[in-house]
Amino acid sequence: MILDIEMLRSFYASYSDSVKQAKATVKRPLTYAEKVLFAHLYDPTQLRPYKRGIEYVDFRPNRVAMQDATAQMALLQFMNAGKDKVAVPASVHCDHLIRADVGATADLPEACKTNKEVYDFLKSVSQKYHIGFWGPGAGIIHQVVLENYAFPGGMMVGTDSHTPNAGGLGMVAVGVGGADAVDVLTGQPWELKMPRLIGVHLKGKLSGWATPKDVILEILGILTVKGGTNAILEYFGEGLDSISTTGKATICNMGAELGATCSIFPFDENADEYLRKTGREEIAVLAQQNASELRADDEVMANPSAFYDQIVEIDLSKVEPHLNGPFTPDAATPISHMKAKGPANDYPMVVEVGLVGSCTNSSYQDLARAASVARQAYEKGIEVKGQLIINPGSEQIRFTAERDGILDDFKKIGALIMTNACGPCIGQWKRHTDDNTRKNAIVTSFNRNFRRRADGNPNTYAFIGSPELTVALTIAGRLDFNPATDTLLDKEGNSVKLDAPTGYTFPPKGFAVEDKGFIAPSADNANVEVVISPDSNRLQKLAPFAAWDGKDLTDMPLLIKTEGKCTTDHISMAGPWLKFRGHLQNISDNLLMGAVNAFSGESNKVKNQLDGKYVEVSTAAKAYKAQGISSIVVAEDNYGEGSSREHAAMEPRFLNVKVILAKSFARIHETNLKKQGMLALTFCNKDDYNKVQEDDRISLTGLKEFAPGSKLTVTLKHQDGSEDSFLVEHTYNDTQIAWFKAGSALNFAAKK
């Protein structure tokens, strides 16, 4: 059964005409990303040649996807909107709350028991408001979306930063916060700054141990975690033909680590085959009928530099297997360099655990190729040195992989098969170790490797690679093992070499599954009741934030001046805190607990200016709030890098933090702050960051003249009586300023 088929038929019936009208209006050929964007304008009569990276544009996405950790807050907000049902097709996926411990057989029932209140809430909200519900164990959101919902030429938003995964099948798929999702769910325009376009030209063909994962790991080394901010990466070139749809999805998935709005590949025969193999032949036919507009125009391909803002050249034949890390996904290292780089940087060289899975690399092809490496270790008599953990991407993949013997290949070398869920990738991992503070190395096929992310240990050095390389390094137990050149010893002491991985793109017998774990939207929702206990410590109804009082912000205490990388993991930690994602008051206790205090070098320890004592960040914020005092956070570059979790914006707002002043922001987080009525401001001169002192009282003036393009003034009153003043800037437009004045975007929408 093809889900939401009527919407898809309607979309394709008008798509090509919409693109042709766009070309006639802007009077030039279009890139593929532009075609999709222009075909989804909220008001097509407003179509014009928008200024990339400058103008905000209103769009009308086709659908919304939500995962269980972020869906709670999104749907709590939606419930306040007064709607009977969602305006566009939507789905909820229960994948983030399942803890990996001893294996799927025990872990899944335990998760269903532990999270029953949240699952029941999400299920009932989904039934009441006509939302598709994928229960615990059904799979990871982005793999399930790729298998069931993604379609060429479409536009989707999702409350998860790796939503761009669907770009592998030709979608503009963008990670957003819950408030953005609510805009789409209620039929309002969804606002996005018109993205810049980065063209990535792929030529040649991957070979040996090189994989699509290594392509994006190499690009991360080139562009860094900020290089894609407010941009779409559009891939083109002859190299595309040799990369499968799931391989392309992997590349698009980790575009999130570049800070990109999304990434996209054009429709091709690989996409056509993927649609047919996943039971969506009618969509394949519809896409073929629109094929000429599901790729960039020929004139663009003839002269790419005239149409893209930047070009990145990648020769696939020269791509090496990579290990990126530790602690940041853009620290790119070809595996051939690790023998020198590892010791030089004092990396722990023993690989203790290898983890295969995540939304980035959990497809059938990923598991099949990784299993071919595991099978060699078993057949060649190689003793496996590390622990191997596997998370399949969906129940359909798990069932098919088990039928085809793939999971047995892993089990034969001692691998542990976890639930079809995020697990360790999002910090949901009960790691069995002798010392959870010890310096050690793990290798994963995941997407992020921030300090403490996987297991909570700040001394775990996490490196990102392909599933194939992850298995090879786990077998060898060494970070510097190069499977292309190095040998291992079998049980008789003979030197043996691992052959390059192989594996089917699709299961030869086709995909199979007994129960996908899906509950379809129901039209019979009149008697569905959504109950939230007032005594719950996991779910809490939301109260509107207060509107701006019309005054400047004066004499604010500094809550924290953060030093270095401050991701959404640092601002609102996941792992054990995921259970409070539906309870704003409780989860606010983790505010900025991972951020490093620039004055002490310590985490979660700041000076409470009311009594001079050093306390947890949330404790200081609550003390200020109790006295009716607003506070401010000062930060460095790319503040809010990482996930789309809007809790990282809602928590400071809840605790009366009014301003985040940073050197620069990550795209999603900046939008989330604006949506919650906060002020996300940047230094005009980044050196002014150094003027901020621990005991400062900080004032922000000029808010009565707050307007697009205007500058505001920050004044620092130092403890010694001296002062510093400097200008700060912002990216707010008129609508976003209205959100601030109303107290939040939801407040503003409610007033309209």
Annotate each language-model stretch with its function.
Residues L47, E147, F151, I243-A249, ...:
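Short glycine/threonine-rich loop-to-helix capping motif typified by GTGT followed
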Residues Y42, Q46, K51-R60, A74, ...:
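Terminal amphipathic helices with adjacent charged low-complexity linkers/tails
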Residues L488-T505, E670-W739, L746-A749:
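Acidic, glycine-rich flexible loop/linker segments
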Residues L8-F11, Y15-P195, R581-V633, N638-G640:
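Long, structured ligand/cofactor-binding scaffold of large enzymes
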